[in-house]
Regions:
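Helix-terminus/linker motif at the lipid-water interface of multi-pass membrane proteins
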Residues: 35-54, 123-130, 186-193, 253-286, ...
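Small-residue-rich hydrophobic transmembrane alpha-helices
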Residues: 53-113, 150-169, 276-334, 338-340, ...
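Hydrophobic alpha-helical transmembrane segments in multi-pass membrane proteins
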Residues: 22, 26-34, 71, 103-112, ...
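Residue-level signal for short hydrophobic patches within transmembrane helices
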Residues: 12, 16-35, 39, 62-69, ...
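Short alpha-helical transmembrane segments in multi-pass integral membrane proteins
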Residues: 1-23, 81-146, 190-246, 302-367, ...
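Short runs within selected transmembrane alpha-helices of multi-pass transporters and secretion channels
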Residues: 74, 143-161, 169-180, 198-213, ...
Length: 448
């Protein structure tokens, strides 16, 4: 299997340096994606006021609920493509690529219609205050118009990650990120378009990243080359993509439903707390990118080595990923804790908003390494093709704990601090269940 200069050989050689080489561009890519939203938040917070800031921020959990099922399914495409590519199965690899891209296009169009029709209703269901709901609904509707571009980019990038290429998606996001930032400044500051301006800028930047990743696949002279005339659904491979991807997507969607429920609890404190949570939640996003990039590496490396039956190497991959994840997330979490006030001032100058954001960060940043551990074991299991049970355990541990917390504890001790202690509590419980599940699945693999 001949590899180009962008690809990483996951099945041979040292592991730690290759994991870092794979994870670092992926981490930077995730940071750039978050910066789309961060720039939106910073620009509206600074130039359109706290109500506009709350309007944009209140849509985050809902957008994630709508999109994460399909983004989760892209993990199934990643796992299947990695397995076929490592095994040198060119025809199967090509069919997987064309099935994945077709699925991305269809799901993106569906999500665009869903967002346009149900955005305001969903915001009302969450109890979004009257003073921001109009702007929130406008932002969501424009954002969802770009959903086909968003989906095509993410599925295309999943294919590239499957073959060990995380550098080109990073380059594409650098280009689209610069465009997004420039358009934000032009549309909001010069043309005073407020939330509509930042939404339009995001859609245009997503279109650019979509075009770049599709061009990359189209011009590739490999088994994953894209031919538009071959775009169709292969039901055999679609089923295999769904077997891994749907549980991952359901898990992500349900967890974001719990976050939407938590957003509703934050909404009960008013627009100031909402703005503080918006800024703090954006910081969480940067922390999660660090742990998720290692999880993605673990899944891709595990899948390729599983495809060529290098089971002992899979174990070393998991151990090295745990080391990278814990060190990275703990360091970043401590940084966010100690410099939280300075970071929050980037988003807003309102002292009350900063106070609310600091209260949230105080209970969630230092223990964030637990979130990394919690995600790694399901990532390794998905790499081996097991996705259903990890999904159930994550829903029970994460969502169940937060629901019990929100309805059982929070009403009797109403404060942002009490509300957000539910995060580390849910991470700890889920880790215990996921490690137990991994132990039994891994024993079965040893006997294969």
């Amino acid at each position: 299997m001949k590899q180009n200069k962008y690809e990483i050989d996951m099945c041979n050689g040292t592991i730690m340096d290759k994991l870092i080489s794979f994870s670092l561009p992926l981490m930077l890519s995730g940071i750039l994606q978050l910066m789309f939203n961060a720039v939106d938040i910073i620009v509206v917070g600074r130039f359109s006021g706290s109500q506009a800031l709350a309007a944009v921020g209140s849509t985050t959990a809902l957008i994630n609920v709508f999109t994460n099922l399909f983004i989760g399914i892209s993990l199934g495409a990643n796992v299947l493509a990695a397995r076929f590519y490592a095994a040198g199965k060119d025809r199967e690899m090509s069919d997987t690529v064309h099935t994945a891209v077709t699925l991305a296009l269809v799901s993106g169009i569906v999500m665009a219609f869903v967002g346009l029709i149900f955005s305001r209703w969903a915001l009302e269901l969450m109890g979004t205050p009257d003073d921001v709901i109009g702007q929130s609904a406008l932002y969501m509707k424009i954002y969802f118009l770009g959903m086909p571009f968003f989906m095509l980019y993410n599925y295309g990038a999943a294919i590239l990650r499957a073959v060990g290429d995380t550098k080109r998606p990073l380059i594409f996001l650098v280009i689209s990120g610069i465009v997004n930032a420039v358009l934000n400044l032009i549309l909001v500051i010069m043309f005073h378009m407020d939330v509509a301006g930042v939404a339009i800028a995001t859609v245009i930047s997503q279109l650019i990243s979509c075009i770049l990743v599709l061009r990359c696949l189209r011009t590739s002279k490999t088994s994953y080359q894209l031919h538009f005339g071959k775009l169709r659904i292969n039901t055999v491979y679609l089923k295999q993509i769904f077997q891994v991807g749907i549980p991952a997507g359901i898990q992500s969607t349900v967890i974001n439903l719990s976050n939407a429920l938590l957003q509703s609890s934050v909404n009960s404190f008013g627009s100031t707390a909402m703005a503080g949570y918006t800024a703090a939640n954006n910081i969480f996003g940067f922390l999660y990118v660090a742990v998720n990039s290692v999880t993605q590496a673990c899944m891709s490396f595990t899948s390729q080595n599983y495809g060529v039956h290098k089971f002992k190497r899979m174990d070393r991959v998991l151990v090295d990923c745990l080391i990278i994840s814990i060190v990275t997330s703990f360091s970043l979490g401590c940084g966010a804790y100690f410099f939280g006030s300075e970071i929050l001032k980037i988003y807003t100058a309102d002292p009350e908003v900063i106070r609310c954001g600091l209260e949230i960060l105080s209970y969630t940043t230092v223990p964030y390494f637990l979130c990394g551990i919690m995600d790694l074991f399901p990532g390794a299991l998905r790499g081996m093709g097991h996705s259903g049970v990890p999904m159930i355990l994550s829903v029970i541990g994460t969502v169940g704990t937060r629901i019990v917390w929100i309805f059982g504890i929070f009403p009797h001790h109403r404060s942002l601090a009490v509300l957000f202690i539910s995060y580390p509590a849910s991470w700890m419980l889920t880790i215990i269940m996921q490690v137990t599940c991994f132990y039994f699945v891994r024993r079965k693999v040893h006997r294969v």
